């Protein structure tokens, strides 16, 4: 099975967390204590699979501003460059549109800002530190 699915079971959520830990905690050195947060239950989580194995994840939730906040986009290093990040973003943006959101916002690692810019996201504000990694806030309309 290949594709992106909405996480609907506890087992699939654990798989999504395993991808996040592999990318953010093990690979990038983000403290495990900040990887899981208070927004897990309210967020819609997505899981990318290749031959049934979890290779990527993302989530979206409604931000305080009312925009769709896309977060925790991660693809295992063994599957980067295969389009899974774009597929995860497509799924999150589509679900956000279905929920009535007309704008998406995200806090991108500066090293990934080009990926999001190619999808129509524009920088809003300056660089800031999150978990020891430089980030920038980016946003785009979802009606395009």
Question: Where do the language-model regions lie?
Answer:
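C-terminal "cap" of GNAT-fold acetyltransferases
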Residues: 109-110, 129-144
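Conserved beta-strand in the GNAT
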Residues: 47, 53-62, 66-74
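Conserved GNAT acetyl-CoA-binding A-motif
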Residues: 96-109
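Conserved acetyl-CoA-binding loop-helix of GNAT-fold acetyltransferases
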Residues: 75, 81-94
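Active-site rim helix/loop that mediates acceptor-substrate recognition in acyltransferases
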Residues: 21-54
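Conserved active-site tyrosine of GNAT-family acetyltransferases
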Residues: 20, 116, 121
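Conserved N-terminal entry element of GNAT/NAT acetyltransferase domains
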Residues: 1-11, 144
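A conserved beta-turn-beta hairpin within the catalytic core of GNAT-like acetyltransferases
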Residues: 62-71, 80, 129-134
């Amino acid at each position: 099975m290949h594709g992106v699915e909405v996480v609907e079971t506890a087992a699939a959520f654990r798989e999504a967390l395993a991808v996040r830990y592999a990318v953010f905690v093990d690979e990038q050195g983000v403290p495990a204590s900040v990887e899981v947060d208070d927004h897990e239950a309210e967020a819609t989580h997505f899981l990318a699979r290749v031959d049934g194995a979890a290779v990527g994840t993302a989530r979206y939730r409604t931000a305080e501003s009312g925009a769709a906040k896309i977060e925790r986009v991660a693809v295992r290093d063994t599957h980067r460059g295969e389009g899974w990040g774009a597929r995860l973003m497509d799924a999150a943006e589509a679900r956000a549109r279905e929920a009535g959101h007309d704008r998406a916002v995200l806090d991108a690692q500066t090293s990934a800002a080009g990926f999001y810019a190619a999808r129509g996201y524009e920088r809003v504000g300056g660089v800031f530190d999150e978990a020891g990694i430089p980030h920038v806030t980016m946003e785009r309309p979802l009606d395009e």
